[in-house]
Amino acid sequence: MAVATSPSRPASRATPSLRGVVLALFVASGAAGLVYQVVWSRELVLVFGNTTQAVATIVTAFMAGLGFGSLAGGRLAGTSRRPLRLYGLVELAVAAMATLLPFAFHGLADLYRGLWPSLVERPGQLAGVRFGLALAAVAPATFLMGMTLPLLTRYLVRTLDEAGARLGELYAANTAGAMAGTLLGGFVLIELFGLRLTSYLAVALNLTAGLGALALSRRWEAGAGSEEAPAGRDGQLAGPEQAPAGRGARPVRPEVPGWFRPRRRAVLAATFVSGFVSLALEVLWTRMLAEGTGSSIYIFTTILAIFLFGIALGSLLYRRFSRPAGERLGTLGLCLAGVGVLAQATVVLGSGMVGHVPFVVRTVVALLPATVLMGYAFPLAGRLATPSAEAAGGSVGLLYAANTGGSILGSFGAAFVLAGTLGTNGSILLLGGLNLLAGAVLFVADPAGRTDPGRSAPDPDRRAADADRPTVDPGRPTADPGTTGPGAWRGGRGRTRAVGAAMAGLAVLGLVASSLDLPVTRTRTENELRRTGLPVTHAEDELATVDTVGGPAKGRRLLVGGVGMTSLTVDTKLMGYLSKALRPDARDFLVIAFGMGGTYRSGLELGLRTDAVELSPTVPSRMPVFFPDADRFLHHPKGRVIVSDGRNYVRLARETYDMVAVDPAPPIESAGSVVLYTREFLTEGKARLRPGGTFMLWIPYALPMDDFKEHVRTFAGVFGHVRLVLSPGRHGVFMFGSDAPLDFNEASIRQVLGNPAALRDLNDVPDHPPTDADGWVEVVRRSQWLADDRLRSFIGSGPEITDDRPRSEYFLWRRAFMDDREYISESSLLRAAPR
């Protein structure tokens, strides 16, 4: 049997201490990669918008680079004499690209802005352009990132028996680094340094990994290509499989036994399915666990960190407990089936059937068991797909590419197909069933399960592998899986079929339940609302869950993601009426965030051409729950509802307006809402105004006073004239800005708020008493708070909210050490007004 004498074989063995240093470098690389993912995704969202289609495009471009990079890295790993040196060069190249990429985003934004008007009516072509631009921006860097795992696998793997263990170490190290990057970036770095500087700190990590690898390579790979005698276990090569060839030797590939190819195809297929299910579950678990929390960045960071921790822990457990005898298709099948069962069990938490469970507890309980098995399965699959030590890098590259391909489809499937058809919990049941089926197939297909009960059959996999490997690592004992592997405890073919049938039965049960209307397939919010006895509607789209509560006017509510968005209130109607009172000659009105539709409806009542931009496609269709005459306004000739990202629309659209009203989704700290409060957005919004137009931004109460001043300071830094009005419904503050003076006069108030149609509209609310024209004149007079010079005296100097420093979203440490813990309300603002 031919033995490989490839000149690509690394010349030195990675000793335990050297291996520890290499793993530490890979931890740094993993941390940098996660920071890049956060920062670059945010930059691209600002370019393309926060719609599900745009986000899916970004994720696809990012992961496509990783997948193709892993394939290329696997090929290079099989031909490189110095894979550690090549790894170091790749890390330095990532650092160089990451340094330049922030500048490229600006050019990308300008290019997309120029293309958008001609493509906005052709969504298919627009999606293609988005994907092409996102791919051009991030794929070169992510391509290089994808190369790193195969290269280091090639460097560390010296014998076939240790392939899984080394891959487990590497996968655990990189995933642990990603978890560290998640926690440091989400909880510390972005708040302290901003997005741009945080990305440069990640560049420093790549530089450390790259330079460290090059230094190690000079010391330990310097002899590559020279003749070296095989040596023993203590840090040197042993056996002909590890001996480097002399100069000029013709590389001979080790023969791959016939039984191996079908097994590798099965492993690759299972890895593809696992990638699909895992990424889809991550999307759906995030939606399920974040429901009702307000969706702050700290919630998402915690979910992702626990997800990554479980994967890293699973890989470490594989490294600690795996044995060659247990590295079977059946073991991989058990892992996949276990993930399926545990995933299906999480819907009990997601439906609220166990009562109130603190967020961190339910996140750990839901994610940790399944993700540990995910982390265990990947290095196991890598070992099963590797025919020889020389092929380890290529096998891992192929495996990672298959996993990434499944992940891309999983992210699309979860958002665009599953959530909208089966709902969050139903989709989780379906995905769990899919993993169970995949696990059952692998379990039954394992040759070890086809031995007769009580008999021991020689393992064909091990026997063929031993024939190809004249030497083995004395540190890793071999065993006959017919007596010590899965075949022994499985008890033969009959029991194998029984276990496989049980897996399939659980899968079918989950698949059937996923399409039924059961308490376990409903979200926690829907179950809670149904118990009130009020009329409730529930829907899910690619963005979020949408629940409405009908009945008496005072109790009507709209909830998105389990969080109350708004209720029937005079404040939403006044957003249009007060803007019109400031500019009585206004003809056009732009509303950002549809909500119940109250502001949009009032704009049409005022006779304005009204455009409303809403991110969720489901929310506008719920307007009839709150307004009996909703159909008239939804189909009004002067009205237009645009399902899009409000920030993106303001930046790209060429229309101009006399009035703009922005009412971001609460809470004000939620991830995604901050982009409607930054200086850059306000500047773009100002550009959509005609001369003399008014821009209204809503600030809810229950915000720390210092944070409130930051918002006002940012707003006042963009608009030359600013006036703040305390809402009559006592829910928050209207901030009005313009390039012209802003003054309410009695005549315009009577004209806009005092006519019969306006009075009917404004008085049809449960949170404000019926008022006549004189009463509204007095209400507006009392509600005015600060303007221009007095306002600037109140806010003083200090930081503003920007895209790079999203201070309203990242606030943890600032609030932890905040001296003034006063939260704004009507009374606190009246006390704080300068005399």
Task: Mark where each language-model region is.
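Alpha-helical transmembrane segments of multi-pass membrane proteins
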Residues: 2-455, 461-746, 750-751, 805, ...
